[in-house]
Amino acid sequence: MKRDEFHTEKYYESYNIFGAHIVTEDEMRGVRFTVWAPHAKAMSVVGDFNEWDYEQHKMLQVTEEGIWSLFIPHIEEREIYKYAIETMAGDVIFKADPYAVYAEVRPNTASVVFDIKGYEWNDKNWSRKKKKKSVYKEAMTVYELHFGSWKKKEDGTLYSYKEMAEELIPYVVEHQFTHIEIMPLVEHPYDRSWGYQGTGYYAATSRFGTPHDLMHFVDECHKYGIGVILDWVPGHFCKDAHGLYLFDGTPTYEYKDKDVQENPVWGTVNFDLGKREVRNFLISNALFWMRYFHIDGFRVDAVANMLYWNKEGQEQSNEHAVSFLRELNEAVFAENEDFLMTAEDSTAWPLVTAPTYEGGLGFNYKWNMGWMNDVLKYMECAPEYRKYIHDKMTFSLLYAYSENFILPLSHDEVVHGKKSLLNKMPGDYWDKFAQLRLLYGYFFTHPGKKLLFMGGEFGQFDEWKDLEDLDWNLHDFEMHRYMHDYFKELIALYKRSKPLWQLDHSPEGFQWIDANNNEQSIFSFIRQGDKQEDALVVVCNFTKATYENYKVGVPDFEYYNEILNSDAEQYGGSGQVNKKRLKAIQEPYHNQAAHVEITIPPFGVSILRPVKTRKGSKKQDGSKTKVRSNVTSRGKR
């Protein structure tokens, strides 16, 4: 690296220069320490090796813009250290290394010398398989989890990365999730920030073990066909004294202007995304996790907070952030075109998942926060009043193809007094389970990839408690076992049913049969795959009423079978199912060529699959009928 390159040009391997590197110089083994502190008056390295005396190992300033460096011989791996920084005000402050790849276990805050290289990976088969598939036309089910509270040992201590590989991976495989999404694993001082208020961006948190232990965990995930997505927070960081905040006594990584520096809601500060050094720090960090940890994707947190300045009373876009996100995504996809870059964005910013060359931000997925908010508000409403907010369940289809969406039932909605998904459902005990089964049925049949927070799969009753583990004892109760069985059957059905994912991002993959039955709160629609015979009919009843001989318009197949009914007794339902083959009556209904008469279960979802291939019904011009949505697509990535 040229001396000025880090300050003026795109340099995405800054972790190779900065931090603590075990090297041999002048035939002496030791550690080369390099750090950026543009307004420091003097710098030194301190640790047990010099009894934390900042007068002993003074660093040399190697660029006018504030790069400092020093080689210290005879220091070995696992040595703890910090930088002692003399500020322009004459104070001496002690800081952890921004580029450290390992740190002490909290509450201690020193950095640790660690050789990040040397792990032998065994995931070449995983990499080859990924390249053969297009994620856009594949099933995608993401299990979101918090590493520290998924499961704990009997004595309350945390499972390590290696132990989690043994505990978590078989569970994820059993449930047929395609990916896990882990809440932030960068080093962070405060457990209850869940990792979102980090400061050690290059250090996998030592709460669970070493960086090599985390590599082992990812390697094992890949061995069993599970992708690993990490929550990543490039927008803001914590203000703890040992971290990035006021690193050299002045705003270094954060904005100088207090109006845009502070995040009063979170108690954090925003990265100055207009600085080349900060961009290089963050984009290098993303590539570092990709290269060293073989991560398969990032869920980029709080994109809305990045896109807009947080000045009170203003909604002005932050052009630094817009430019940064485009640069970030270009760098990531240049590194790995099969990577997942998901934006957690609640705004209406256009073209989030469009390529940068089309004027987009360059992500390939976006959380559909609007769908999540609308659907949960609808489900929390008393069933008899749902007819008055009917549009909350249909509105999402007006924009479902404007972006590549993931439907999130995430941690944000089951904490801070919002209740668990199960407990959001109104009514008595039976009603709650029936409606959660219904919600999941709608979730898995609506266009978009899927994400569920841990515990939802068996109907966690209490909201998420981040200092405890999940209520695994609920499996002792029959209704929770029924829920768990239902969820596993539903996800298995989803994965083997091409209509439910093959055209997720194309309007040809969805068609309303009846979106207007607000009086009965019944919705029916078709999901379509690439082939005409790959079609499913879905009927959802959001009230407790049961309907016999209910007419539903269907595509022109001769017979239909009900392949899933959430009211089946084996799932804890009342047993209002359609056991017999359903003959399609050749009379048009709901703008379809034929219809079937079925039993609609209470708080139930019924999924029908055609038995025989389409008979070849013709339009007047002689062409075959094609199932089609009336929504216009934005276009594929």
UniProtKB/Swiss-Prot annotation:
One Pfam family linked to the record: Alpha-amylase
Region entry Disordered, spans: 611-637
Catalytic activity, reaction form: Transfers a segment of a (1->4)-alpha-D-glucan chain to a primary hydroxy group in a similar glucan chain
Gene Ontology cellular component list: cytosol
Comp. bias intervals (Polar residues): 628-637
Keyword flag Transferase: yes
Molecular function via GO: 1,4-alpha-glucan branching enzyme activity; cation binding; hydrolase activity, hydrolyzing O-glycosyl compounds
Pathway: Glycan biosynthesis; glycogen biosynthesis
Keywords: Carbohydrate metabolism, Glycogen biosynthesis, Glycogen metabolism, Glycosyltransferase, Transferase
Keyword Cell wall biogenesis/degradation attributed: no
BP GO annotations: glycogen biosynthetic process
EC number(s) stated in the UniProt entry for this protein: 2.4.1.18
Main enzyme class: transferase
SMART domains membership: Aamy
Highest taxon, organism lineage: Bacteria
Active-site residues, Swiss-Prot/TrEMBL: D301 (nucleophile), E344 (proton donor)
Quaternary structure and partners: Monomer.
Protein's job: Catalyzes the formation of the alpha-1,6-glucosidic linkages in glycogen by scission of a 1,4-alpha-linked oligosaccharide from growing alpha-1,4-glucan chains and the subsequent attachment of the oligosaccharide to the alpha-1,6 position.
Protein family membership: Belongs to the glycosyl hydrolase 13 family. GlgB subfamily.
Name listed for the protein in its UniProt record: 1,4-alpha-glucan branching enzyme GlgB
UniProt source species: Bacillus cereus (strain ZK / E33L)
Higher taxonomy: Bacteria, Bacillati, Bacillota, Bacilli, Bacillales
Annotated gene: glgB
